[in-house]
Amino acid sequence: MKTKIMPKSHLGFNQLIEDIAGQYSGDKVETPITYTPAQWKARGEQYGLKSECIVIHDGGDYGPFFDLDHGHYEAHDFMQEELAKHGLWFETCTTWYSAIYKND
């Protein structure tokens, strides 16, 4: 499998996540709420600081893609598989946010 280009900016991560969710659902999805690790640290958060991006998914279109508690296993796996094509993976940190990391 050839790795696709990894996003180079915060807005690039937003667009990638939105595109993957839209591809799965076949509908337009809301723009994800994301933070850079620096923004996340400035909020006083402790986890996900070594990630590439933090995604907030509490009460929105993105919960089924990042939190298995929603029971949408296919959506969750689809997001993981599509991110992997860009050299990325995510970890669900809590039921309301996840961190996206580079594959090493």
Language-model features: where?
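An N-terminal amphipathic alpha-helical segment
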Residues: M1-P64
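Ser/Thr-rich, low-complexity intrinsically disordered terminal regions
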Residues: P32, T92-D104
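Acidic, low-complexity, intrinsically disordered interaction modules
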Residues: R43-C93
